[in-house]
């Protein structure tokens, strides 16, 4: 669960999520949404796709990020997804994943996409409601909703003083792919029907908006470059990365890419000096320190990993994923004092990352080691609820109630979890998202 890691299908990375948030926050504000209430998640999939699910969560495929030529293209796509959120557009899919964990949502989307494309009904398809499997409409917005989200996106981009040209370029790329293949194989096109009227509408807006020639900011251009370099280094074979960024390239991004590639081999004799050089030059960058902590932790050097992780958290105090990584390091150090610190950091992190099962799992471990068995059971109940496992959630909630003082905050939360878990479909008991 460190840095760029998670289930096979999705990537959690503090830096990339923060950078995308930086780019899209002006759009969220223009839409009248509270930025802290929104999440952006990366799906590890080379196909072009993005979608909204489970409330105010915007999902974006790594394939779309890597294909974006400009920040404006990425912002345009996310402005469109924000249009769906602001418009309260619900597909039947939205209803099905209302309370699902991030893994659960992605498993359903991939299952639905495979079924819609006729790629067998194995795996994820079993998680869909019966009529959803049969009907493509499960994931699909209506043409009216699509037009409405486009209209909203134009409004938000104008209000933020940004160009809609990126969205038009993105539509043109998709249209080209559709014409080439002659089918609707692209998952984005299946869930977001693209009509010539939609393209015309955006083109017309670009012709008339006074913001159409507003260039991308140098800061955003730099952010997208760094996102793509980091994503590429984490998802391509290390040999590919090292060939793309030979030692003679001493730019910051090339060294960052090489540090990641060496760590993934794993060759710490080369990875550590490379990342140490970047830390020396950029002492206030939390993510270089995070990578160093990750390298050390994953190679069994737990005690050495604590300091870089602590420094990363000090430099990015608002990043819950960094707190979860640091807490994991504290727990693995097998020091009771550190374990107490882990409990404090995790309680802080799960307030915003309540859909991230790993935080709850680590919290249960830390409470267990601290002999707070009632609180450990409560954390396991939260994990069960988040993962959509009705039986686990209810069993652990009852266990917590038996161990915690009656009417304490924990006792009352256990009661609520037991009640909330009733809403989970029984079918999902057999679904293991991890």
Segments (PLM) and residue ranges:
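Extracytoplasmic and endomembrane cell-envelope/extracellular-matrix remodeling and assembly machinery
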Residues: 7, 12-14, 18, 40, ...
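Catalytic Zn2+-binding segment of zinc metalloproteases
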Residues: 82-99, 117
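Helix-start (N-cap) detector for alpha-helical repeat units in TPR-like alpha-solenoids
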Residues: 252, 286-287, 303, 320-321, ...
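Residue-level recognition of tetratricopeptide repeat
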Residues: 260, 294, 328-331, 365, ...
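Residue-level detector of the short coil/turn that links helix A to helix B
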Residues: 266, 300, 334-337, 371, ...
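Terminal, low-structured helical/coil segments at or just beyond the last alpha-helical repeat
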Residues: 369, 378-380, 386-434
């Amino acid at each position: 669960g460190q840095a760029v890691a998670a289930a096979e299908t999705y990537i959690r990375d503090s830096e990339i999520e923060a950078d995308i948030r930086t780019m899209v926050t002006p759009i969220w504000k223009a839409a009248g949404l509270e930025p802290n209430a929104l999440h952006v998640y990366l799906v590890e999939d080379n196909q072009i796709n993005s979608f909204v699910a489970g409330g105010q969560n915007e999902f974006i495929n790594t394939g779309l990020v890597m294909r974006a030529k400009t920040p404006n293209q990425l912002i345009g796509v996310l402005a469109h997804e924000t249009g769906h959120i602001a418009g309260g557009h619900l597909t039947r899919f939205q209803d099905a994943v209302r309370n699902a964990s991030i893994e659960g949502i992605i498993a359903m989307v991939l299952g639905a996409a495979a079924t819609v494309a006729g790629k067998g009904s194995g795996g994820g398809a079993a998680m869909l409601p019966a009529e959803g499997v049969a009907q493509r409409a499960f994931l699909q917005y209506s043409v009216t909703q699509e037009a409405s989200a486009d209209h909203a996106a134009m409004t938000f981009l104008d209000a933020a003083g940004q160009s809609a040209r990126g969205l038009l370029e993105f539509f043109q790329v998709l249209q080209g792919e559709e014409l080439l293949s002659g089918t609707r194989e692209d998952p984005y096109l299946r869930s977001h029907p693209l009509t010539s009227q939609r393209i015309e509408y955006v083109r017309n807006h670009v012709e008339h908006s006074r913001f159409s020639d507003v260039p991308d900011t140098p800061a955003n251009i730099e952010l997208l470059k760094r996102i793509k370099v980091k994503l590429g280094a984490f998802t391509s074979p290390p040999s590919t990365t090292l060939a793309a960024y030979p030692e003679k390239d001493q730019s910051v991004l090339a060294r960052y890419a090489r540090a990641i590639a060496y760590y993934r081999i794993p060759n710490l004799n080369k990875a550590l000096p490379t990342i140490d050089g970047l830390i020396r030059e950029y002492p206030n960058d939390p993510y270089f320190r995070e990578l160093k902590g990750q390298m050390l932790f994953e190679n069994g050097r737990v005690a050495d990993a604590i300091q870089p992780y602590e420094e990363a958290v000090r430099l990015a105090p608002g990043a819950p994923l960094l707190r979860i990584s640091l807490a994991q390091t504290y727990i693995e150090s097998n020091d009771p004092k550190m374990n107490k610190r882990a409990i404090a950091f995790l309680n802080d992190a799960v307030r915003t990352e309540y859909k991230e099962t790993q935080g709850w799992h680590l919290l249960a471990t830390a409470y267990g080691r601290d002999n707070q068995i009632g609180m450990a059971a409560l954390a396991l109940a939260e994990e069960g609820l988040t993962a959509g496992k009705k039986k686990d959630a209810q069993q652990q909630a009852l266990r917590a109630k038996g161990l915690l003082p009656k009417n304490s905050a924990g006792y009352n939360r256990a009661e609520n979890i037991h009640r909330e878990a009733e809403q989970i479909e029984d079918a999902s008991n057999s679904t293991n998202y991890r």
